[in-house]
Structures are given as C-alpha cells and as structure tokens.
Amino acid sequence: MRAPVGPWADDPLWAGVYDWSVEHPRLGRLGWRLVVGSNLSLLYDAVAEIGRLPAGAAVLDVPCGGGVALRGLRPGQGVTYIAADISQAMLDKTLAAARRRGVAEQVVPSLADVAALPLADGSADLVVSFAGLHCFPAPRPAVAEMARVLRSGGVVSGSMIATDTGARYEGVRRLGRRVNMLGDMCSRAELVAWFAAEGVPDLRVTTSGAMAYFRGVKA
C-alpha cells in the first residue's frame, strides 16, 4: 500500500496529487495558489520551451517524476527526451504518460542519481528540473551535474521551493521536511551562485509564492 506522504522516490500518494494538479489546470491553479501561493501558469510556460526544440535535439528531464513536463513534448518532434529518475516507479509513470501523449518513441528512460548522471559532458541541449531541486538530499551536487551535461549555449530551466521566499511559507517548508517530501533545499541566491560557478552566469529567477522558477544559458 502506498503511503500518503514520504520521499518522492517512494511514489507516495501526494506525488499523484502533484501530477493531477498539473494536468487539471482549473483546479490545479487554485490549489497551487492556496498551498504554495504560486501561479501554475509559470510552469506551463516553462515546459512549453521543450516543444520549441528542433529535431535532433536532446533534452534531459531530471527528476522526471510522473512525467508532467512531457506536456511540452510534441508528437513527431524528433528529439531525444532523456527521462531520468532515481525511482523506477517514477520512470514507469513517465513512460505511461508518454504513451498516453503519443510521444513514447522519443522518451529514453534512465534510472539514475542526479548526483552522478550517466551522460557525457555537454550532451544535452536543454536540461529541465521542475519541482526537483527541493526534493534532492543535496541540491549543490545536482546543480553541478545538470550544468556538466549541458552543452555550451544550452538552456537549463526549472522550479523549486526556495528557502528564502518569506515567513509565510515556512510552514510548508517545515512540514515538507518533516514528512520527507522535501530535502535540504536552498535559497535563490545560493542557486544563482552555484550555477554561476558551474558556467551558467546570469541565471534568471522569477519568484511566485514559495516557488522560484529559474532559467539560464551555459557559457
């Protein structure tokens, strides 16, 4: 029986709530506003960048979770979509979502630890990590690996719950850590500094409630 809460890698029931909220915009937008004070449209806008990649491009989605970012991938787009996650259960959910969306032939599953990605340096044109960095045990090594596999001129994009978005959301952060849904997390300033140290200068960060959306280009 699935537990209601716990680490995302264990596929708790709460992970399904996250996926459902993204796939049902009308109620999802309301839920995101109430829980984390965030505009769900920012996620949809960020995911849409995947659909603008040309044929032959490679995108890494880590952690892919239930496959919510697949909504940006177009059938017949001709890209290689590497779906990486430390949980086989999450990979299975992503593959099921890919089949429903008619994009399964573009998706390559990879059972992997974000701190040691099995990809060559500079092999990805786009790296996305939506609602991922706040789940990792240590976000700093994850940032280093995401930047390592990104090619020069490639884009990194994602979202996370940040530690410095105000006291209003401290209850969300504390509860998330208590039930093992959230890891160490980091501040927006730390995220910018870490990516800059890894060759991604001028990371753009947009704050929406407890969430921070980020996008940068590797030098």
Task: Describe the function of each predicted region.
Residues 58-116:
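Class I SAM-dependent methyltransferase SAM/SAH-binding core
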Residues 51-53, 136, 150:
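A generic alpha-to-beta junction signature in SAM-dependent methyltransferases
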Residues 58, 153-155:
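Short glycine-centered segments of the SAM/dcSAM-binding site in methyltransferase folds
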Residues 126-138:
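A short SAM/SAH-binding and catalytic strip from SAM-dependent methyltransferases
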Residues 12, 28-32, 157-214:
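C-terminal alpha-helical "lid/dimerization" subdomain adjacent to the S-adenosyl-L-methionine
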Residues 140-152:
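A short glycine-rich, Lys/Arg-flanked "PGG" loop and its adjoining helix->strand segment in the class I
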Residues 115-126:
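A short acidic, Gly/Pro-enriched loop at the edge of an enzyme's catalytic core
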Residues 1-53, 68, 72, 174:
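Conserved class I S-adenosyl-L-methionine
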